């Protein structure tokens, strides 16, 4: 196993070098102000860290003098091993970029782990495309239609609680849709190809539309006051505002009975959607438990 070339460095500096590499690999670029803002260091210290990273991994980074930024090198090879879960938490919450997760928790705590994780190389190509506004050529593997080649314009990651998706405009179907990250292979940026106006996220009606959902204790529950306590329901109603593109995933994750007559049975259905018409024309409503619709956006 190759020795860690940063092992002799102080931990704070190793953390900054790791941050440089994360930005290069998953955003495609890093600038001196990124380090200054993230770590509260002086400009001179940020310059030294960037110079040191380039010295340790010269193939990983190219300097663009015009934009005063460091870009991902064509022969990039990571210095740091990072789990995909840690990368995703950093991308979505700015957490976990400094140190590896501790093997010892402060308190005993158990949580279900994900059964699947996206490959880091695929994830990196997609996140760079999102950050830089690139068009991607991909091979996509669908449960219903098998493998196909597509061009997509990605703009956001979606965590459904079970797996990760990328929201993108699909040039093959000429629609906005969700693609499961683990089903994407051979992602390649189409350099010089820019997104047309109708392919941009502000044109995605399901993305820009916000739906307001009122959830109440399921009428079949003998003790609704317990649900009031669990979900901190003022007035017995939990009001949510969600993007239409995310609504169906969220309702499925929370096992919300979305049938008009609260007809679903079982202890898992603690909540009921008070007005199922709130999901009218929401494409992901097909995923909502009990919702009376046969239309959806299966990918």
What name fits each language-model region?
Residues 1-82, 215, 264-299:
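Short, basic/aromatic recognition patches that contact phosphate-bearing ligands
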Residues 67-69, 163, 237:
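A generic structural signal for beta-strand entry/edge sites
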Residues 104-105, 109-229:
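Core beta-strand-centered patch of the WYL/Sm-like small regulatory domain
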Residues 53-56, 187, 253-257:
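Conserved short hydrophobic interaction patches
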Residues 72-141, 253, 260-264, 268-273, ...:
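Bulky hydrophobic/aromatic content
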Residues 46, 53, 158, 164-168, ...:
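Long, contiguous hydrophobic alpha-helical segments, chiefly transmembrane helices and signal peptides
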Residues 208-299:
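Polybasic (Lys/Arg-rich)
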């Amino acid at each position: 196993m190759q020795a860690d070339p940063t092992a002799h460095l102080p931990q704070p500096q190793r953390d900054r070098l790791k941050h440089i590499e994360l930005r290069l690999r998953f955003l495609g670029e890093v600038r001196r102000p990124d380090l200054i803002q993230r770590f509260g260091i002086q400009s001179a210290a940020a310059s030294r860290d960037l110079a040191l990273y380039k010295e340790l991994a010269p193939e990983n980074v190219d300097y663009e003098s015009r934009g005063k930024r460091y870009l991902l090198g064509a022969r990039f090879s990571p210095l740091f091993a990072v789990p995909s879960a840690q990368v995703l938490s950093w991308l979505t919450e700015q957490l976990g970029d400094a140190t590896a997760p501790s093997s010892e928790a402060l308190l005993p705590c158990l949580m279900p782990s994900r059964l699947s994780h996206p490959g880091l190389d695929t994830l990196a190509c997609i996140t760079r495309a999102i950050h830089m506004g690139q068009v991607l050529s991909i091979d996509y593997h669908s449960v219903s239609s098998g493998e196909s080649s597509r061009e997509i314009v990605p703009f956001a990651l979606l965590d459904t609680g079970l797996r990760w998706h990328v929201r993108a405009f699909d040039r093959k179907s000429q629609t906005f849709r969700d693609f499961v990250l683990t089903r994407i292979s051979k992602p390649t940026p189409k350099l010089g190809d820019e997104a047309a106006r109708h392919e941009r996220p502000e044109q995605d009606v399901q993305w820009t539309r916000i739906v307001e959902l009122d959830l109440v204790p399921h009428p079949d529950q003998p003790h609704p006051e317990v649900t009031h306590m669990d979900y901190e329901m003022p007035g017995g109603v939990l009001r949510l505002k969600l993007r239409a593109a995310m609504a169906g995933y969220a309702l499925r994750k929370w096992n919300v009975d979305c049938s008009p007559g609260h007809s679903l049975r079982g202890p898992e259905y603690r909540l009921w959607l008070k007005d199922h018409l709130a999901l009218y024309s929401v494409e992901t409503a097909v995923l909502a438990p009990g919702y009376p619709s046969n239309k959806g956006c299966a990918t």
